[in-house]
From Swiss-Prot:
UniProt-recorded name of the protein: Structural polyprotein
Phenotypic consequence of A756V: In strain: Isolate RVI/CAL.USA/91, Isolate RVI/CAL.USA/97, Isolate RVI/ISR/75, Isolate RVI/ISR/79, Isolate RVI/ISR/88, Isolate RVI/MYS/01, Isolate RVI/PAN/99, Isolate RVI/SAITAMA.JPN/94, Isolate RVI/SHANDONG.CHN/02, Isolate RVI/SLV/02 and Isolate RVI/TOKOYO.JPN/90
Effect annotated for changing S34P: In strain: Isolate RVI/CAL.USA/91
Effect of A1036T: In strain: Isolate RVI/SAITAMA.JPN/94
């Protein structure tokens, strides 16, 4: 019978070491492994049963693989596959059965304090510690009353994709017997590593932890710790396991790698072959350093490449000003930097900012003039095609034969007379001929500006432009790069797609008679190859590739051992729940705020607002037509504001009297009556010259024979009544107009869908709601707007001008084509013509109509007392429609630019998709008004037929879709009339009132460069893809890289939640 002496841990350790030495000797001698014979019904190792030599009186727990009768040295590597197969094929020799050992008594464990403690029972385990001992694992050799070393208890991890991002933490002891053994099929037995020293995980986690798995996804090294990552399935659920591996075995040798690995790091290290020598932070920092060096030298190495020949020698135009203009030579302006981009203008000895004194279109490279002279002679600086002209006009007889001068073909300078210019010929139909040097219609300060159709003869001068310089616009390394014109000399002739280049122009390629210029990396690389690979172009290619190399390094480092596709599918695709559509309902919603309608859910228009970029255009004071007068029952001696002070208001009379181009008239009514002043009637000749000798006045004196003097009732018929009227255009002190430009306007419609707010625009006309998707037929945005904030005698209101003005056409004198002063003190536009005064009787049928433009009607009114009468004054519209007047602003503007003429179409998608009906009949009463091929949209209005939405086409061009009813839209027209309109069915002819661009131009005026805008062309997707193949390829690469990065980030965040708070 076996001894019942208590077994200590030291005795157990010595026995295990002796057994290990015996096994090593046996394996060294080449002896085969001995196996304990089993009954035939118990050959299967997976079944549990009693051994043949064990007594049936008491069960015995097997200890790991030793319970199967297999002995193996765990501190050494497993035998090769050939030897393992050979050993399995041999039949083991039978051995005599051993006597069943007695059930051992509970041993005594050394406590280190001279005492002993009962050893755990080796029977059925009752706790995790006993279960670990029963599996053959021991606690580490240390004093249990002292603190365990760091390596005594380590942490491994498990997580399952079926349970979400939930991590399970398993704390266990290391076995110090080396690498864990293998089963007979060559798989690991993780149960031999399970020796928990922390809380017992749930049963399904323990079952997953003990699941055998031979595939290893990777071996991770961090400091002195090593982990093996595995993934496997348990009952259809995919699990991930991260196991802590021992660093050294009992005999001091390094632990070998597991035999079944699917990936192995090839980077070598002297100590740990599978460790990574350099991690991602070092590689990423090195890449950032290279990128910083490359970008830092990009400005020096990246220069636009111009493939050009030697520039031709251009003759300089002469600067002859003539002997008669020597006193004006010191006033010639000289542009400091770029005149059309805010340069300086020298007037006399003073330098002023060009933006303060020049018209607005001067700065935009258009046409304009600036008056530098006094009232007696017109001296102007004119600007057109980014060139400056010095124009002088005075009363000197013209020379007999002027000699014109024409510059070289490559120069854009206009013709310049070699001699002093002469004034224009008399007559409005004459022109300056060879004397014209680019000066256009002047706006002079004196009234004698009626010669040559307002064309002023003059000299042309040019300033010395700086040489043409280019720069490259880098956009984060994304092709194509653009060429930026820093300074431009017009004589060089650089153009971008046929349009002359100006400072600030951005273009992929510039062309001139001297060659081409580009910043494209492909062209730069080609030119670099042709020029023996110069350093600057090689550096350009390197800078282009560095960002993509860094992205590739980061993506490869982040995604090399993570399932990017699975994580992207799980996080991105599974996280998006598209709305389920059902029936389609279509209705309309009025555009007034507060309107509501009922689709499957109630929809209400909460409000309308628009967003834009605002640029202040200054302020101006509009011209104001003001008139006053008096009705007197006698002929006054002094017909003026002073002489008529008792009948005429003093303030308006003085304001009108001091105005420009005033009209003042005095009428004598019933002058041929007997007595009194009747003898003066013979002196009322048409000019009233004799009357002026006795009654000094600045007014015109005219008789008014035939008018009734009933206004002065209660007098004899021989009395004489006089009427005095005064009118002029003045600057009203309480009327101002401020101009603001709105660009990139976008209308935002604020809807309330079943209580949920939703904003729709032309870019995003959809609303995703819990009830379905709402699609809104949003009218097009108004485009560029001009806001006129008019403050007339304290009553402020805003008017809106649609579209950008045509400053090179009929809008050259409009408010938006001027640069106004901030203090609203500038009067804009040409000086108004003199108003016309007319005396009209009270019963004249003419009073049933309205006064004509520039007319003022004066009517005497009978007073309520004797010798008392009054005047009724009616003023007509202004006599010049191209000048800034309140009526001009009201005629060319609207009060609500973003209010569409028709309702909003609402399409609500809810169960059975149905196709929306489309109108197949032609629209009715379609009218087209505007201009074609001029870059500005024309107005198209009419009535859409019923039966569904009308997809309107004008001469084959798609204009838009409109619901049944009245529609108003704007469209760019490329063809002249007639216009055929259709809604998908038969076409009908529309009435048209359009003009071409030639009808908008002035004769004899030189304009700046402008392009003709056309409507958007139609092309197929294949044509579009062929034209943008490079952008599509680059976009696909960027999308793949971005998807990989997002997948890595999503998966990291997905698992980080469970790693921070494991269960």
């Amino acid at each position: 019978m076996a001894s019942t002496t208590p077994i200590t841990m030291e005795d157990l350790q010595k026995a295990l070491e002796a057994q290990s030495r015996a096994l090593r000797a046996e394996l060294a001698a080449g002896a085969s492994q001995s196996r304990r014979p089993r009954p035939p019904r118990q050959r299967d190792s997976s079944t549990s049963g009693d051994d043949s030599g064990r007594d049936s009186g008491g069960p015995r727990r097997r200890r790991g693989n030793r319970g199967r009768g297999q002995l193996r040295d765990w501190s050494r590597a497993p035998p090769p596959p050939e030897e393992r197969q050979e050993s399995r094929s041999q039949t083991p020799a039978p051995k005599p059965s051993r006597a069943p050992p007695q059930q051992p008594q509970p041993p005594r464990m050394q406590t280190g304090r001279g005492g002993s403690a009962p050893r755990p029972e080796l029977g059925p385990p009752t706790n995790p510690f006993q279960a670990a001992v029963a599996r053959g694992l021991r606690p580490p050799l240390h004093d249990p009353d002292t603190e365990a070393p760091t390596e005594a208890c380590v942490t491994s991890w498990l997580w399952s994709e079926g349970e979400g991002a939930v991590f399970y933490r398993v704390d266990l002891h290391f076995t110090n017997l080396g690498t864990p053994p293998l089963d007979e099929d060559g798989r690991w037995d993780p149960a031999l590593m399970y020796n928990p020293c922390g809380p017992e995980p749930p049963a399904h986690v323990v079952r997953a932890y003990n699941q055998p798995a031979g595939d290893v996804r990777g071996v991770w090294g961090k400091g002195e710790r090593t982990y093996a990552e595995q993934d496997f399935r348990v009952g259809g659920t995919r699990w991930h396991r991260l196991l802590r591996m021992p660093v050294r075995g009992l005999d001091g040798d390094s632990a070998p790698l597991p035999p079944h690995t699917t990936e192995r790091i090839e980077t070598r290290s002297a100590r740990h072959p599978w460790r990574i020598r350099f991690g991602a932070p070092q590689a990423f920092l090195a890449g950032l350093l290279l990128a910083a060096v490359a970008v830092g030298t990009a400005r020096a190495g990246l220069q636009p490449r111009a493939d050009m020949a030697a520039p031709p020698t251009l003759p300089q135009p002469p600067r002859a000003h003539g002997q008669h203009y020597g006193h004006h030579h010191h006033q010639l302006p000289f542009l400091g930097h770029d005149g059309h981009h805010g340069g300086t203008l020298r007037v006399g000895q003073h330098h002023r900012n060009a933006s303060d004194v020049l018209p607005g279109h001067w700065l935009q490279g258009g046409w304009g003039c600036y008056n530098l002279s006094d009232w007696h002679q017109g001296t102007h600086v004119c600007h057109t095609k980014h060139m400056d002209f010095w124009c002088v006009e005075h009363d000197r007889p013209p020379p007999a034969t002027p000699t014109p001068f024409t510059t070289a073909a490559n120069s854009t300078t206009a013709a310049t007379p070699a001699t002093a210019p002469a004034p224009c010929h008399a007559g409005l139909n004459d022109s300056c001929g060879g004397f014209l040097s680019g000066c256009g219609p002047m706006r002079l300060r004196h009234g004698a500006d009626t010669r040559c159709g307002r064309l002023i003869c003059g000299l042309s001068t040019t300033a010395q432009y700086p040489p043409t310089r280019f720069g490259c616009a880098m956009r984060w390394g994304l092709p194509p790069w653009e060429l930026v014109v820093l300074t431009a000399r017009p004589e060089d002739g650089w153009t971008c797609r046929g349009v002359p280049a100006h400072p600030g122009t951005r273009c992929p390629e510039l062309v001139s008679p001297m060659g081409r210029a580009t910043c494209s990396p492909a062209s730069a690389l080609w030119l670099a190859t042709a020029n023996a690979l110069s350093l600057d172009h090689a550096l350009a290619a390197f800078v282009l590739l560095v960002p993509w190399v860094l992205i590739f390094m980061v993506c490869r480092r982040a995604c090399r051992r993570r399932g990017a596709a699975a994580a992207l599918t799980a996080v991105v695709l599974q996280g998006y729940n598209p709305p389920a559509y059902g029936e389609e309902a279509f209705t309309y919603l009025c555009t007034a705020p507060g309107c509501a309608t009922q689709t499957p859910v109630p929809v209400r228009l909460a409000g309308v607002r628009f967003e834009s970029k605002i640029v202040d255009g200054g302020c101006f004071a509009p011209w104001d037509l003001e008139a006053t007068g008096a009705c007197i029952c006698e002929i006054p001696t002094d017909v003026s504001c002073e002489g008529l002070g008792a009948w005429v208001p003093t303030a308006p009379c003085a304001r009108i009297w001091n105005g420009t181009q005033r009209a003042c008239t005095f009428w004598a009514v019933n002058a041929y009556s007997s007595g009194g002043y009747a003898q003066l009637a013979s002196y009322f000749n048409p000019g009233g010259s004799y009357y002026k000798q006795y009654h000094p006045t600045a007014c015109e004196v005219e008789p008014a024979f035939g008018h009734s003097d009933a206004a002065c009732w209660g007098f004899p018929t021989d009395t004489v009544m006089s009427v005095f009227a005064l009118a002029s255009y003045v600057q009203h002190p309480h009327k101002t107009v401020r101009v603001k430009f709105h660009t990139e306007t976008r209308t935002v419609w604020q809807l309330s869908v079943a209580g949920a707010s939703c904003n729709v625009t032309t870019e995003h006309p959809f609303c995703n709601t819990p009830h379905g998707q709402l699609e809104v037929q949003v009218p097009p945005d108004p485009g560029d707007l001009v806001e006129y904030i008019m403050n007339y005698t304290g009553n402020q209101q805003s008017r809106w001008g649609l579209g950008s003005p045509n400053c090179h056409g009929p809008d050259w004198a409009s408010p938006v084509c001027q640069r106004h002063s901030p203090d609203c003190s500038r009067l804009v536009g040409a000086t108004p013509e003199r108003p016309r005064l007319r005396l009209v009787d009270a019963d004249d049928p003419l009073l049933r109509t309205a006064p004509g433009p520039g007319e003022v009607w004066v009517t005497p009114v009978i007073g309520s007392q004797a010798r008392k009468c009054g005047l009724h004054i009616r003023a007509g519209p202004y006599g010049h429609a191209t000048v800034e007047m309140p009526e001009w602003i009201h005629a060319h503007t609207t009060s609500d630019p973003w209010h569409p003429p028709g309702p909003l179409g609402l399409k609500f998608k809810t169960v059975r998709p149905v196709a929306l009906p489309r109108a197949l009949a032609p629209p009715r009463n379609v009218r087209v008004t505007g201009c074609y091929q001029c870059g500005t949209p024309a107005l198209v209005e009419g009535l859409a037929p019923g039966g569904g939405n009308c997809h309107l086409t004008v001469n084959g061009e798609d204009v838009g879709a409109f619901p049944p009813g009245k529609f108003v839209t704007a469209a760019l027209l490329n063809t002249p009339p007639p216009y055929q309109v259709s809604c998908g069915g038969e076409s009908d002819r529309a009435s048209a009132r359009v003009i071409d661009p030639a009808a908008q131009s002035f004769t004899g005026v030189v304009y700046g460069t402008h392009t003709t805008a056309v409507s958007e062309t139609r092309q197929t997707w294949a044509e579009w893809a062929a034209a943008h193949w490079w952008q599509l390829t680059l976009g696909a690469i960027c999308a793949l890289l971005l998807a990989g990065l997002l997948a890595c980030c999503a998966k990291c965040l997905y698992y980080l939640r469970g790693a921070i708070a494991p269960r």
